[in-house]
Swiss-Prot record:
Na(+)/H(+) antiporter that extrudes sodium in exchange for external protons. GO terms for cellular component: plasma membrane. It catalyses: Na(+)(in) + 2 H(+)(out) = Na(+)(out) + 2 H(+)(in). Belongs to the NhaA Na(+)/H(+) (TC 2.A.33) antiporter family. It comes from the Bacteria. This is Na(+)/H(+) antiporter NhaA 1. It comes from Pseudomonas syringae pv. tomato (strain ATCC BAA-871 / DC3000). GO terms for molecular function: sodium:proton antiporter activity. It is a multi-pass membrane protein. The keyword Membrane applies. Keywords: Antiport, Cell inner membrane, Cell membrane, Ion transport, Membrane, Sodium, Sodium transport, Transmembrane, Transmembrane helix, Transport. It is found in: Cell inner membrane. InterPro entries: Na/H_antiporter_dom_sf, NhaA.
């Protein structure tokens, strides 16, 4: 693949980053509205119609399945495009740039998982959900961050974005390694063949997007049938899209596709996913239910594990001289961003559905834990950033 050398951000690239944050932030606010609407509908007289619609079968799969395996492949494709762009020519282009978000992302995945495991140890039916609190929802987090305006320096927003992208990369690897069902070898070979064709297109210097997208659609089908989660086709396709000239959208297939996908993902795909997956009936939720191992492990993994893991490892890296605070920021702001990373919504709900297939009661417990952990993480992050923002 084409590997441009790290560079100083051009005005075009800076404009692209500003559009990126604007779309993510606005998309995060719409996602909040979609999640709230799902909760209201799921606890209203429309609840039966809501759940019936999600379970309606179209072309052999339920609507919910189409959303989680189909639409979310587009979300994961965008994640893959962001990872590749940042790794080759962006905020993660060198090891020094990767150090702070890298250490932070590692802590933000390991500590929440350990907290979940601590609450679910010895429970084979629930221990498989250990990865649920290990993910950060970049759209939600940036949406909340946008409410604080100029109290938060751009460097912190870039840090949060880089951290979340590495977090997403970790989540993709977790899904591939730990949440893959029984494999169909013929379909897996067909998927690998599709990836080989995509790599060949890249090596041959093909810049037209249509051949990549057509082969990518085949790859999605083969992965769906292979037992590997179909959304990973989006990541594989994205990593094969050529970057070209990273400072010119017109000559960069990757930037062009990323620019086209952003509004669709931010304003359609993710809100639809949120509306389809956040709906949970609260009728049977009691205090006793809230302290069950799954919701407690998920909620505390997000609320406590994220902020402790991210802040502790980031501070360790800074104190050891391996990284430095983002420009114009302070320790309080870094802690506030660490707290915001406890907003796990989209990826946490997604992993929850993979962890407990055929166990709707456990999936509902995951939803409650994710909602509680995410809401309190958002509130804590806002309070801390408002307190320390004037010094940013």
């Amino acid at each position: 693949m084409h590997n441009p050398t790290p560079r100083t951000e051009s005005p075009n690239a800076l404009a692209f980053i500003k559009r990126f944050f604007a779309a993510e932030a606005a998309g995060g606010l719409i996602l909040m509205a979609a999640a709230l609407a799902a909760l209201i509908v799921a606890n209203s007289p429309l609840a039966d119609s809501y759940f019936a619609a999600l379970h309606t079968v179209l072309a052999g799969m339920s609507v919910e399945h189409w959303i989680n395996d189909g639409l979310m492949a587009i979300f994961f494709m965008l994640v893959g495009l962001e990872i590749k762009r940042e790794m080759l020519a962006g905020q993660l282009a060198s090891w020094s740039q990767r150090a702070l978000p890298g250490f932070a992302a590692l802590g933000g995945m390991v500590v929440p998982a350990l907290i979940y495991v601590a609450f679910n140890w010895g429970q084979p039916e629930t221990i498989g959900g250990w990865a649920i609190p290990a993910a950060t929802d970049i759209a939600f987090a940036l949406g909340v961050l946008s409410l604080l305006g100029k109290r938060v320096p751009l460097s912190l927003k870039i840090f949060l974005s880089a951290l979340a992208i590495l977090d997403d990369l970790g989540a993709v690897l977790i899904i591939a390694l730990f949440y893959t069902s029984d494999l169909s070898i013929p379909m897996l070979l067909a998927a690998l063949g599709s990836i080989a064709v995509l790599v060949a297109l890249n090596r041959l210097g093909v810049k037209k997007l249509l051949p990549y997208l057509l082969i990518g659609a085949l790859l999605w089908f083969f992965m769906l049938q292979s037992g590997i989660h179909a959304t990973l086709a989006g990541v594989a396709l994205a990593l094969c899209i050529p970057l070209g000239k990273a400072d010119e959208e017109a000559s960069s297939p990757l930037l062009h596709l990323e620019e086209k996908l952003h509004p669709w993902v931010a304003f359609a795909v993710v809100p639809i996913f949120g509306f389809a997956n956040a709906g949970v009936s609260l009728a049977g939720i009691t205090v006793d239910k809230l302290v069950d191992p799954v919701p407690l492990g998920v909620a505390l993994g997000l609320l406590i594990g994220k902020q402790v893991g991210i802040f502790a490892l980031a501070a360790l890296a800074i104190r050891a001289g391996l990284a430095r605070l983002p420009d114009g920021s302070n320790w309080g702001q870094l802690y506030g961003v660490a707290a915001l990373c406890g907003i796990g919504f989209t990826m946490s709900l997604f992993i929850g559905a993979l962890a407990f297939p055929g166990a709707p009661a456990l999936v509902d417990e995951v939803k409650v834990g994710v909602l509680i952990g995410s809401v309190f993480s958002a509130l804590l992050g806002v309070v801390v950033l408002r307190r320390f923002g004037a010094r940013g």
